[in-house]
């Protein structure tokens, strides 16, 4: 067997081959039902087509075939019908990953995006539990050592962030049009965007035009040219993920699978693909917005917004290991290879562990909503019991959305012992704090310390993807609850085991 996510125990053939493995899917839905479906996959196929391949570290792509019933001589017969456009998409992605293995390192082009949600200057480089600018700087240094061509370097993350802020950003109210144009890292011609846009399905064009006007819109557009915030440095582009909505609407739109993004959002990714010609893109930290754009929940079609953005571009995502529900969203809707990174230790480790148990139950409930509704009543009862035991306010327990909102607020309000830096082993008092944080997971301090010495694997995985190599799978969750499953970090983490749903 490929390993079922436990390659260290069984010996995964994927790990031995060392190449990325793409999982394409066939659904029992007819083509008509699939095209109209929000779920994108039938519930019978999800386990074998999504959950199990994730355990093996496969890249989850999309549906390439549907099932049609036909009347034959002996009654109804099911036949798999290929979807040519979808097959082309997966084949193109396979070629892109393969190209990373054979292309000279000095010729490869890399895009690294920092998040910016809400789209204010003070939120540039935000990432849950991660020092994203410093981590990006360490990624760049590691890739340069592997051969990435740069014209100059940054001493640290603060210097990188300062240069980004001195350029064009998603918040430019005080800049003149002349300065906006001068500070833009590049432009996408409006006519090129419009020509591309006319090929979108009618309903997609209509919903975008109703919200953002006719292509190419007005958001970060000057003289019919879409502006591109970021920095070009040799074969590297360090960008700022585009704003999905106005600052006032950003929070409400963040997790919406219904709200269309601005024209500039799609144009920004098109520029990365077709003008800058990136060979690979890295989204730094939890979490971005591309995986939450409108479209199917699984098995996306070529006109779902995440596919419109990324197309055949390899997508890699350093992501905090204790947010598996949101991380797997990027795996399933943006074909992402996740690189799990350590969370920063919490001062209130005991409470944090209880909150993580609640978070796991919420994730199980959300999965059951999509794939196994028979479990909902049992999980809802468990959720209410856990919420009552934690003395969560009644108003937060009225709905699951309220409970998730309360949990997110508490997470952000807890005192962290500094942000994690990708690939950096904690030392001194930081090491002591993190060992204390992990000590509730059942391992000895000696074993934990040994596993923490493997944190540099987070950067090793970044370099592996740059070279088109396989990133081994691993578990996710709070390391203080189950360090054996979660550590070491630097693996392509999966969410819940199917048996937990």
Give names to the regions the model predicted.
Residues 1-501:
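Ligand/cofactor-recognition surfaces for anionic moieties
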């Amino acid at each position: 067997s490929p390993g079922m996510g436990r390659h260290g125990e069984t010996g995964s053939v994927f790990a031995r081959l060392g190449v990325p493995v793409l999982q394409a899917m066939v659904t029992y839905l007819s083509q008509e039902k699939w095209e109209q479906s929000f779920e994108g996959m039938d519930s019978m196929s999800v386990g074998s087509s999504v959950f199990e391949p994730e355990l093996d570290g496969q890249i989850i792509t999309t549906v390439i075939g549907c099932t049609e019933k036909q009347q034959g001589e002996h009654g109804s017969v099911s036949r798999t019908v290929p979807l040519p456009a979808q097959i082309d998409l997966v084949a193109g992605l396979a070629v892109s990953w393969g190209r990373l293995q054979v292309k000279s390192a000095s010729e490869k082009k890399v895009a690294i995006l920092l998040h910016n949600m809400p789209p204010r200057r003070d939120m540039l480089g935000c990432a849950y539990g991660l020092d994203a600018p410093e981590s990006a700087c360490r990624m760049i240094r590691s890739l340069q050592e592997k051969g990435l061509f740069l014209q100059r370097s940054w001493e640290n993350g603060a210097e990188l962030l300062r240069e980004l802020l001195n350029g064009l950003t998603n918040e430019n109210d005080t800049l003149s049009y002349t300065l906006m144009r001068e500070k833009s890292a590049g432009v996408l011609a409006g006519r090129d965007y419009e020509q591309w846009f006319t090929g979108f399905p009618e309903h997609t064009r209509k919903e975008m035009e109703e919200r953002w006007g006719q292509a190419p819109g007005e958001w970060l557009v000057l003289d019919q040219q879409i502006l591109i915030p970021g920095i070009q440095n040799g074969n590297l582009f360090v960008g700022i993920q585009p704003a999905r909505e106005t600052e006032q609407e950003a929070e409400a739109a963040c997790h919406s699978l219904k709200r269309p993004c601005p024209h500039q959002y799609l144009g920004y990714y098109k520029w990365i693909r077709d003008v800058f010609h990136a060979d690979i893109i890295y989204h730094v930290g939890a979490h971005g917005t591309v995986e939450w754009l409108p479209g199917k929940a699984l098995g996306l079609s070529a006109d779902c917004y995440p596919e419109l953005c990324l197309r055949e571009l390899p997508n890699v995502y350093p992501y905090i290991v204790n947010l598996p529900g949101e991380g797997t969203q990027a795996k399933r809707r943006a074909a992402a290879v996740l690189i799990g990174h350590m969370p920063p230790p919490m001062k209130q480790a005991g409470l944090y562990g209880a909150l993580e148990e609640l978070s796991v139950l919420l994730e199980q409930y959300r999965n059951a909503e999509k794939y196994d509704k028979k479990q909902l009543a049992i999980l809802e009862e468990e959720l209410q019991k856990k919420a009552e035991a934690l003395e969560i306010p009644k108003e937060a327990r009225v709905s699951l959305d309220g409970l998730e909102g309360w949990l997110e607020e508490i997470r952000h309000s807890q005192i962290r012992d500094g942000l994690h830096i990708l690939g950096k082993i904690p030392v001194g008092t930081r090491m002591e704090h993190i060992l204390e944080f992990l000590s509730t997971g059942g391992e000895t301090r000696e074993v934990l310390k040994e596993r923490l010495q493997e944190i540099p694997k987070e950067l090793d995985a970044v370099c592996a993807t740059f070279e088109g190599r396989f990133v081994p799978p691993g578990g996710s969750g709070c390391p203080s609850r189950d360090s054996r499953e979660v550590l070491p970090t630097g693996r392509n983490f999966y969410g819940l085991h199917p048996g937990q749903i």
